[in-house]
Amino acid sequence: MAKYYVIGKVSKELLHRMQKDPTADRFISTQKVIEAVGGKMISYEWVRGRFDVMCCVEGDAETVVGMKVAFLNSGLMDELMIHEVIDYNKAFGKAADAAKSVVKPAE
């Protein structure tokens, strides 16, 4: 399974709901959504900065996109970014192979 980092900005609606119920377990509710689409949540953290929430999810691309659509359509999130974890050694190895085939004009 591929691993993805999902970084999100919560909506004002969710902020209001959490202020009314600060002990609500967002980990469990988030985990249920991810499992409903066939994914597995590895970690879930609230962070300071431009975004509010970061979680690590295992699954395929369709699973993670399905989760994203469900959260955005719920109105609880304003923005979600998906970042797939890659093997950078393989990626740069392929870049090195491809570079051997690059032909610049007029050379």
Q: Language model features by range: what are they?
A:
Residues 1-107:
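A compositional/biophysical signature of low hydrophobicity enriched in polar/charged and small residues
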